[in-house]
C-alpha cells in the first residue's frame, strides 16, 4: 500500500502556495466525509517532501504492542492500584527476547526523536516546527514506522513520568528521582488535571496509530492506483500521521512544563483547549481511517472472491479421480475443520465420509418450507429402509448434504434468532449437514448463484464420485420418481419419461396410498380443487348423486390449491370436507404441497428436456390443471388409471343438470362419455372455453422458460409477460413470475 501512497503524492509534488490571502478552501475526500483544507493540502506536499524511505523494515506490530501496554498503564489515574488491575503480559521472557531484537534496530531513532521533541518544546519552538523536524529525522521510515517510533518516544517520556508518580510513596529510589526531576507528586490536583486532560487525547492517538498500521499492512496487489476512490482516500494517511505526531508533541510539552515549573504549574485554559481540539481532530481522522479500512477490506474481499470464483470454476472444469477436491472447495478448505454433522449420530465428521460417493447437495436458505423438508425426509428415509443389506447396514449409493446459505453471512453472525433457526432446521435432519453457514464462503455462494442458478429456493445439485456435476438440480426428479431417478442424470430422466404416460398413476404416485388403491378398471375417480367452499359442496353432492343414479363406483379427493398463500384457508376447507363427509381430503398440508410441486416438477422437467411441444400429453394435461386452478374450481376425472376429462369450474353446472339433460344418454354412451359430451357441447357453448393462463415461478428449480407456448384450448400462441409478486407465506427474498 505504501507504493500506492507514493504514486498518489508524486502527482502532488508540483506544489502550490496560498498567495491569495483568502480563507483556505475545503476539499471533501469522497466516500469518507473528511474535509481537507487547502492549508492541509499544502502541508501534505511539505510532508511528502521529507519522505524518502529506504529498504529497512520496522516490526511495527511488536513495537506498537509494547507502546500500547506502557500507555495503557500510564494513562490510568495516578493511584497505583489502578495500574495493578491490568493483566500482566504472558510469556514475558519470550516477549522480552523478541522485543530486544526489534528495539536494537530502532532504539537510536526513538531516543533521537524523544530528545528532539523534549529540547525543542522547552526552547519555545512551535508545534508545527517540531512536527516537521520529527518528519526530517524519520524520513527514511515508512508512514507507519514514523508514527509508531514517535509514539514510542512519547511512551518513553510519559511512562517514566507516571512510573515515578505511582511508586513515589513506596520506593525511596522513585521518590528521590521524582524530586530530582521536579515531578509534583504531592500536588494531586495538578496531576489528576493533567491525567484527565491527556487521557482522551492519548486514547485517540493510539486509535489512529492502530488504523495507520493496519492500513499499511494491506496487500499491495489489491490496493492499486487503478482504484481511484481507494487511492484518493488512502492519500490522507500522511495527514493522519502529522496530526498524531503533533498531538504527541502537545502531550510532551505539557509534561515538560509541569516538571519545569513544578508545584506552581497548573493547566491553563489554553492547554485544555488545545488537547480538546486535538482529541476531536484525531477522532475525526480515526473515523475516516476506520471507514477507509472498511472500504479497503470490502474491496479486497471482492477481489479475492473474484479470484477464488475463477479457481472454483476452473476446478469444476477439470477432471478428477474422486470428488474430494470439489467438495473441499465448496465446504471450507481448512484441514483442521470438521465441516459436517452426521444426521444420525449428531457428531462432527470430515468430508472423507463422502469420498467416491454420489453426493446430493441440498442447497437452501433458512426459509426452506417444512412441507418440503417433510416430504424429502420421507423419500430419503424410505430409500434407506429399502436399501438395508443382510448385514443390517444401509447401502445407499448416494449421500445427502444440506448446504445452508445465509447471504450476507454477517446477518447470521449477529443474529441469535437466525442461529437458533439454523439449529432447529439442522438437528432433526437424518442426512449430513454443513455444520455452520459460516463455512460456506462468499465466493462459493456467488458460484452457486451463477453456475447453478440458486435463488434461495432449495435446489439439489448432484456431484458424482469423480466430482462431476451429474445434475444442476435433481429436485424435480426426486419429487416425480423419488430415488428411482438415481443417478439423477439427464439420460436417466429421459429414460424414465419414456416409460410414463399421462395417467392418474403418474399424477398421484407416491403421495397417497388411499387414492392409489382406488385405481381399478371399473372405478371412477374425481380429483378436484379450489378455494370456494360453496362450489365444493354443490359439486361434490351433485357428482355423488349422478354416480349413484348411474350405478357407477365414484371416489372423490380434494387436492387443495397451488397458491400456498391460501394455505390456512385450504386447511379449513379440508377440515369441513372431512367433517361433512363430502369426499376424501388430506389432513396433512404437506401432501397438498407435494401434489402441486410434483405437477410443477413434471412441467419443468419436460421443458428442460426440450419436450414442451403441443403434442405431449403430459405437458398438455398439466397445463390444463395449472391453468384451471388459477381460474378457481376444477376437476379431473379418470376411469381407472386413464384420465378422461379435465374441466374448470363449469363442471359443477354439468353435474347439477344431470337429471334434465345427459342422464338419458348414460345407458348408451356410458357415464364418462355422456358427461363429457354434454359438458363440451352444451355447457361450454354457453359459458365459453377458458384459454390457458398459468405462472412459471422463476427459480433455479424452473430453469429455462420456453420462448413460446401455444394455448391448450385454442392452439394459438400465448402472450408472455413478467410480473413480480411478494410471497410471505413461502418466505422468499426474491420471486419473479412469468405469466402465460
Swiss-Prot record:
GO BP terms, alphabetized: phloem development
UniProt GO MF annotations: protein homodimerization activity
UniProt xrefs under InterPro entries: SEO_C, SEO_N, SEOA
Gene disruption phenotype: No visible phenotype under normal growth conditions.
Protein name from the UniProt record: Protein SIEVE ELEMENT OCCLUSION B
Superkingdom of origin organism: Eukaryota
Transmembrane segments: none
Subunit structure: Can form homodimer.
Tissue specificity: Expressed in phloem sieve elements.
Lineage of the organism: Eukaryota, Viridiplantae, Streptophyta, Embryophyta, Tracheophyta
Amino acid at each position: 500500500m505504501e507504493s500506492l501512497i507514493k504514486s498518489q503524492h508524486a502527482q502532488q509534488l508540483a506544489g502550490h502556495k496560498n498567495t491569495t490571502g483568502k480563507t483556505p478552501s475545503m476539499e471533501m475526500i469522497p466516500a469518507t466525509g473528511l474535509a481537507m483544507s487547502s492549508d492541509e493540502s499544502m502541508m501534505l506536499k511539505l510532508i511528502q517532501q521529507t519522505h524518502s524511505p529506504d529498504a529497512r523494515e520496522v516490526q511495527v506490530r511488536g513495537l506498537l504492542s509494547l507502546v500500547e501496554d506502557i500507555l495503557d498503564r500510564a494513562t490510568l489515574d495516578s493511584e497505583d492500584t489502578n495500574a495493578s488491575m491490568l493483566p500482566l503480559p504472558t510469556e514475558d521472557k519470550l516477549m522480552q527476547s523478541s522485543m530486544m531484537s526489534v528495539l536494537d534496530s530502532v532504539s537510536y531513532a526513538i531516543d533521537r526523536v524523544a530528545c528532539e521533541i523534549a529540547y525543542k518544546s522547552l526552547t519555545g519552538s512551535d508545534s508545527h516546527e517540531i512536527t516537521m523536524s520529527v518528519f526530517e529525522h524519520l524520513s527514511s521510515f515508512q508512514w507507519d514506522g514514523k508514527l509508531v517510533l514517535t509514539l514510542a518516544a512519547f511512551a518513553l517520556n510519559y511512562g517514566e513520568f507516571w512510573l515515578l508518580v505511582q511508586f513515589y510513596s513506596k520506593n525511596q529510589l522513585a521518590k528521590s528521582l521524582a524530586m530530582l526531576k521536579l515531578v509534583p507528586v504531592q500536588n494531586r490536583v495538578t496531576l489528576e488535571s493533567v491525567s484527565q486532560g491527556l487521557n482522551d487525547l492519548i486514547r485517540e492517538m493510539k486509535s489512529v496509530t492502530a488504523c495507520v498500521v493496519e492500513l499499511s499492512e494491506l496487500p499491495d496487489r489489491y490496493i492499486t492506483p487503478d482504484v481511484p476512490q481507494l487511492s484518493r482516500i488512502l492519500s490522507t494517511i500522511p495527514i493522519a500521521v502529522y496530526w498524531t505526531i503533533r498531538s504527541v508533541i502537545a502531550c510532551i510539552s505539557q509534561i515538560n512544563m509541569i516538571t519545569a515549573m513544578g508545584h506552581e504549574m497548573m493547566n491553563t485554559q489554553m492547554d485544555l483547549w488545545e488537547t480538546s481540539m486535538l482529541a476531536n481532530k484525531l477522532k475525526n481522522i480515526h473515523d475516516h481511517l476506520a471507514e477507509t479500512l472498511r472500504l479497503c477490506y470490502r474491496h479486497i474481499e471482492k477481489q479475492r472472491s473474484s479470484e477464488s470464483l475463477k479457481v472454483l470454476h476452473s476446478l469444476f472444469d477439470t477432471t478428477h479421480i474422486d470428488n474430494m477436491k470439489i467438495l473441499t472447495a465448496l465446504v471450507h478448505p481448512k484441514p483442521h475443520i470438521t465441516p459436517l454433522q452426521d444426521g444420525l449420530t449428531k457428531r462432527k465428521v470430515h468430508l472423507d465420509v463422502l469420498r467416491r460417493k454420489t453426493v446430493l447437495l441440498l442447497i437452501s436458505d433458512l426459509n426452506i418450507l417444512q412441507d418440503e423438508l417433510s416430504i424429502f425426509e420421507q423419500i430419503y428415509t424410505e430409500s434407506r429402509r429399502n436399501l438395508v443389506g443382510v448385514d443390517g447396514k444401509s447401502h445407499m449409493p448416494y449421500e445427502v448434504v444440506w448446504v445452508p446459505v445465509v447471504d450476507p453471512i454477517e446477518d447470521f453472525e449477529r443474529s441469535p434468532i437466525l442461529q437458533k433457526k439454523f439449529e432447529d432446521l439442522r438437528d432433526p435432519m437424518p442426512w449430513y449437514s454443513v455444520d455452520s453457514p459460516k463455512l460456506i464462503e462468499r465466493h462459493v455462494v456467488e458460484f452457486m448463484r451463477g453456475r447453478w442458478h440458486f435463488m434461495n429456493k432449495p435446489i439439489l445439485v448432484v456431484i458424482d464420485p469423480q466430482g462431476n456435476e451429474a445434475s444442476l438440480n435433481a429436485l424435480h426428479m426426486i419429487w416425480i420418481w423419488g430415488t428411482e431417478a438415481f443417478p439423477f442424470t439427464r439420460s436417466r430422466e429421459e429414460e424414465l419419461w419414456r416409460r410414463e404416460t399421462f395417467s392418474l398413476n403418474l399424477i398421484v404416485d407416491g403421495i397417497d396410498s388411499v387414492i392409489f388403491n382406488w385405481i381399478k378398471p371399473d372405478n371412477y375417480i374425481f380429483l378436484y380443487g379450489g378455494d370456494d367452499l360453496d362450489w365444493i359442496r354443490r359439486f361434490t353432492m351433485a357428482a355423488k348423486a349422478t354416480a349413484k343414479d348411474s350405478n357407477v363406483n365414484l371416489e372423490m379427493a380434494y387436492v387443495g390449491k397451488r397458491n400456498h398463500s391460501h394455505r390456512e384457508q385450504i386447511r379449513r376447507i379440508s377440515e369441513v370436507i372431512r367433517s361433512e363427509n363430502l369426499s376424501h381430503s388430506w389432513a396433512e398440508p404437506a401432501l397438498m404441497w407435494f401434489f402441486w410441486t410434483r405437477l410443477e416438477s413434471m412441467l419443468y422437467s419436460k421443458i428442460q428436456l426440450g419436450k414442451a411441444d403441443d403434442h405431449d400429453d403430459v405437458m398438455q394435461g398439466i397445463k390444463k390443471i395449472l391453468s384451471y386452478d388459477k381460474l378457481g374450481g376444477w376437476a379431473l376425472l379418470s376411469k381407472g388409471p386413464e384420465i378422461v376429462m379435465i374441466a374448470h369450474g363449469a363442471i359443477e353446472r354439468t353435474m347439477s343438470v344431470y337429471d334434465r339433460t345427459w342422464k338419458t344418454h348414460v345407458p348408451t354412451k356410458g357415464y364418462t362419455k355422456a358427461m363429457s359430451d354434454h359438458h363440451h357441447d352444451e355447457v361450454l357453448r354457453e359459458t365459453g372455453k377458458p384459454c390457458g393462463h398459468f405462472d412459471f415461478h422463476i427459480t433455479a428449480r424452473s430453469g429455462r422458460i420456453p420462448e413460446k407456448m401455444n394455448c391448450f384450448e385454442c392452439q394459438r400462441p400465448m402472450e408472455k409477460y413478467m410480473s413480480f409478486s411478494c410471497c410471505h407465506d413461502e418466505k422468499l427474498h426474491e420471486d419473479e413470475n412469468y405469466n402465460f
